[in-house]
Swiss-Prot record:
Its EC number is 2.2.1.2. Signal peptide: none annotated. The gene is talA. It comes from Shigella flexneri. Pfam families: TAL_FSA. This is Transaldolase A. Transmembrane segments: none annotated. Transaldolase is important for the balance of metabolites in the pentose-phosphate pathway.
């Protein structure tokens, strides 16, 4: 049995890609997207028809060019998502504009709009996850959206504090970023030789997974942002893992036994009182890595969102 099939015995595998052909090849349960992946896929000629449809939609649904570009971007994200849902049996994650990461109300408004666009294409709400950055405002937006039956994927998650706040808000799923945590520590104190058990990104997800299971939180833990297959194999047993095509390929090509590494702890504890905003901000601020990577992640997604807008604006 190859390693990918071995992992699938214990964990739901998700494709971290907007490349429809690539997703088709690896048979994942779900797929995740973000502005960077959308931008990459939009540059491929085989998806020109999805772009043309989004452009036509933008022209029809915006008065100014700026409004047309925003409308086209939203439609393009949904077009890709709807196509992906034709080949995955589960759900697809679609991201709210990163520039709204500190605006709860506008994040909610954008999320509702994206869901509405999906429903216009005949996609059920249950098959959509709305991705929001794990800021205080993003978590509060998700809390409200969950009450409306809109499931959310809280992304750019780097600290235990963010994970705890998400669970307390009752969000559907979180995406702790293994690789980006590893990158930060590796740049400051390189691990040589590499020991996966000491990988700070892997340890972070394990801690979150154990905490959630010990306190009976139903929020799904989906490890994300992997740099190497060792990180993925070390988290086998996690609820879900979202994996880029290059790593899916490596796992599919290697035949070796896969052992479950994450197992729910038998001991359970009562849940603590929910954190206040002040507690959240203070505790998160104590983690220099998380503060830096969250702000950087928001900036990078915003840059790619603008690039996507420029690409579409040139076609309007």
């Amino acid at each position: 049995m190859n390693e990918l099939d071995g992992i699938k015995q214990f964990t739901t595998v998700v494709a971290d890609s907007c490349d429809i052909e690539s997703i088709r090849h690896y048979h994942p349960q779900d797929a995740t997207a973000n502005p960077s992946l959308l931008l990459k896929a939009a540059g491929l000629s085989q998806y020109e028809h999805l772009i043309d449809d989004a452009i036509a939609w933008g022209k029809k649904n915006g008065k100014t060019q700026e409004q047309q570009v925003v409308a086209a971007c939203d439609k393009l994200a949904v077009n890709f998502g709807a196509e992906i849902l034709k080949i995955v049996p589960g759900c697809v994650s679609t991201e709210v504009d990163a520039r709204l990461s500190f605006d709860k109300e506008k994040s909610i408004e954008k999320a509702r709009h994206l869901v509405d666009l999906y429903q216009q294409q005949g996609v059920e709400k249950s098959r959509i996850l709305i991705k929001l950055a794990s800021t205080w405002e993003g978590i509060r937006a998700a809390e409200e959206l969950e009450k409306e039956g809109i499931n959310c994927n809280l992304t750019l998650l780097f600290s235990f504090t963010q994970a705890r706040a998400c669970a307390e808000a009752g969000v559907f799923l979180i995406s702790p970023f293994v690789g980006r945590i590893y990158d930060w520590y590796q740049a400051r104190k390189p691990m040589d030789p590499y020991v996966v058990e000491e990988d700070p990104g892997v340890k972070s997800v394990r801690n979150i997974y154990d905490y959630y299971k010990q306190h009976h939180y139903e929020t799904i833990v989906m490890g994300a942002s992997f740099r190497r297959t060792e990180q993925i194999l070390a988290l086998t047993g996690c609820d879900r893992l979202t994996i880029a095509p290059n790593l899916l390929k490596e796992l599919q090509e290697k035949v070796s036994p896969v052992v479950r590494k994450l197992i729910p702890p038998s001991q359970t504890f009562p849940r603590p009182a929910p954190m206040s905003e002040a507690e959240f901000r203070w505790e998160h601020n104590q983690d220099a890595m998380a503060v830096e990577k969250l702000s950087e992640g928001i900036r990078l997604f915003a840059v790619d969102q603008r690039k996507l807008e420029d690409l579409l604006a040139a076609k309007l």
